[in-house]
Amino acid sequence: MPTSTETPILRGGEWLIQPSEADSVFTPERLTEEHRLIGRTAQDFVVKEVQPKIDQLETKDWALSRELLKSAAGLGLLGVDVPEAYGGLGLDKVTSLVVSEKLAGAASFGATFGAHANLTIVPLMLFGSEAQKQKYLPKLLSGELIGAYGLSETGSGSDALGARTKATRQADGSFLLNGEKMWITNGGFADLFVIFCKVDGDQFTALLVERGWGVKSGKEEHKMGLHGSSTTALIFQDVKVPAENVLSEVGKGHKVAFNVLNFARFKLGAMCGGGAIGAIAESAKYAANRKQFGQPIASFGAIKHKLGEMVVRTYAIESLLYRTAGLVDARIAATPHDANDGSAALAAFEEYAVEASIAKVAGSEALNYVLDENVQIHGGNGYVHDYPAERHVRDARVNRIFEGTNEINRLLIPGMLIRRALKGDLPLIPAAKALQEELLGPPAMPSTGADDGVLADELRAIAAFKNTSLMVFGLAMQTFGTKLTDEQEVLMHLADITMDVFSAESAVLRAQAADAAKSPKASLHADAARVFVNDAALRIDASARQALAATVDGDTLRTMLAALRRLLKVTPINTVAARRRLADATVERGGYPFA
């Protein structure tokens, strides 16, 4: 299913050094009727089949989990990313995003679904041999077999390559697997596992391991949230794995793990966006009906601020997610490939690994804000089990740990950009040098490339954000050189600036597209984009100042701070009025105004 507009192909991270046009990005408003149809299918499945059974799932009824996965299979939801030749739907990544958004309402079952569809089916599709695909995919797609993914260990969470689980080659070519994996979703009842281990001492490798070969599950973990999903240790004691069950190649497990994480981070970001949209609806309805001092609390400015800000942050996340999906689909479409081969999708997600990490971090943190304010709007009712607000908070907390902690992903974002620059895939270094020369020349604002038009001030601000990012990147690379990887605090500030650049530009381009399409909601789109840009300017200024002060001192620091003041001359807007308009539209609709 192609996306409904042609998307020019930017390289990963290229938006950081050049402007983009509104017609170059995919937005939710450009969904086709096919996209919307499968979205409604997923939504109906969640509302009618999963949500009525959430309490039963939280009793650890794994038979029900299996039953629901089979129901999802019957609707084709397990095979969105799988070619038709293997029994899947063979749809685009925009569709995959839409389905992930809708599954956010499935509570714990969303984790069950994700471990099966995203972390078992996807790696098999991308890296499996033809024999492996023929053997396992049909049963995974039907729900006959349930999958799980075993990467983490007690001593190697973020340091995945430090795994101690080992596989010893036998004379017949098979492997004896020994070790233990921790925190495995679906660990209590899955039938097939993607397990990462060391072969011959140091060759990091992925194996497809069947439970029937001797895999044992530990006790169920008592978790903060996601009570309706199974999380256990997996124990391997001389489990014999046939040679043909190596996934990819011996010693290539890192490629499997890291590329699957690119997929998973993007989809986790999508679920976070969908979760935020659902929580906004809960807050809007509660605020409209809850009366204090003789009037609905939705009429109070303090509540309007919360609702408005919930919408602003969700709008930015949704915008960057759909933009990324459009880029991935365009890259796949432009790459000659066999439709039954996952190589094009693999290359596309590798290209946009930075954007996937941004989706994961920004999405999980925006959701955290929205869910926390949802509890606050509910007051005491938000803290009790009778309302879903408290469960949402518990269930969502792990999103900042899943698929690489947010700290790890923050380090990856600038790290990957720098590696791309050093390889010549991203002209970051020449752009930073050119900006430095411009800043050190006679006083004048660096060129922004933005002209007049709708949201022109915001585009000029975003150009300034990009220049700020280049200035800090360039100075940090110049000062620390190869030791920049040791300066994690500076890298974290760079990540925050980078995330705000991508989020802000995605929001503004979407709002411009809405205006160009003469959307009746164009003014609301503009409000959301303007508020986000206004506040991003404050965040970027703070991050840049701290990064600069950690990088240089004395006269050099004073010079760079003066340059920063020249760059970030952003006039504040009336965010109070804009948030009020967004809040009023949210209450009137009874939910997210852009849904």
Model-derived features: positions:
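Alpha-helical interface subdomain recognition
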Residues: M1-G105, G110, F127-Q132, G143, ...
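N-terminal glycine-rich flavin-associated loop
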Residues: A111-A131, G157-A160, T168-A171
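Short beta-alpha junctions and helix-cap segments that line functional grooves
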Residues: Y136, G162-A163, E180-M182, G218-H222
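A short, Trp-centered hydrophobic/proline-enriched beta-strand micro-motif
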Residues: G143-L151
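Glycine-rich phosphate/pyrophosphate-binding beta-alpha loops
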Residues: S156-G157, M182-G188, V398-E403
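A short core secondary-structure module
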Residues: S174-K219
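Flexible, small-/acidic-enriched active-site or ligand-binding loops
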Residues: G214-P242
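Long, acidic (Asp/Glu-rich), low-complexity accessory segments flanking structured domains
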Residues: D238-V256
